[in-house]
Every structure is written in C-alpha cells, then in structure tokens.
Amino acid sequence: MNPTTFIISFMIALSGLAFYQTHLLSLFLCLEGMALSVFCLMAISSSYTLSLSTIPLPLIMLTFSVCEAGLSLVLLVTMTRTHQNDLMSSLTLLKC
C-alpha cells in the first residue's frame, strides 16, 4: 500500500474532527480514524526500514489507541448519564 493513502485518510479524519462538532460520538470516531491511519502508516514504515528498534512502535501506538478508545467510551457513557445526550453544546463551561 502507498503511504499517501494513509496520509489522506488522516487528513479526512482531521477535517471530520474540525467540521462535525455536534455530537461527542462523531468526534471520538474521527479520533479513532486518525489513530488507525497513524497505526497503519507506522506499520508500513517499520516494515520498510527493517530495523529492530522500529518494530515495536506500531504495537505501542495500537496500545495507546485502545486506551484512548476505552477512555472515550467511559466519557461518552458518563456524559450520557449526566446530561441525557451527547451533544457538545451541553458541555459549555460558561453556564450561569
């Protein structure tokens, strides 16, 4: 696969993160898309270099991505229980 494909997918996920800011779930899905594209890019680049120091990097990235997915699920469930929705507009800090 071409690394340009994963860079384009990262940019698409980044633009989704910038434009779709209404629901918390859509933001978390865009973050997961970004993490997946970075993981694929790291896996391909470590297979090209064939260096022993770059082999565990995709696994470390995958571990951080799983932790991020778990934390985002906890945040989504907590927000849904407290605010009864996942809209970003209900997270304003300036409510008086």
UniProtKB/Swiss-Prot annotation:
Any Pfam family: Oxidored_q2
Summary of the function given for this chain in its UniProt record: Core subunit of the mitochondrial membrane respiratory chain NADH dehydrogenase (Complex I) which catalyzes electron transfer from NADH through the respiratory chain, using ubiquinone as an electron acceptor. Part of the enzyme membrane arm which is embedded in the lipid bilayer and involved in proton translocation.
Keyword Nucleus applies: no
Localization annotation: Mitochondrion membrane
Name of the protein in its database record: NADH-ubiquinone oxidoreductase chain 4L
Enzyme Commission (EC) number: 7.1.1.2
Organism of provenance: Myxine glutinosa
Reactions accelerated catalytically: a ubiquinone + NADH + 5 H(+)(in) = a ubiquinol + NAD(+) + 4 H(+)(out)
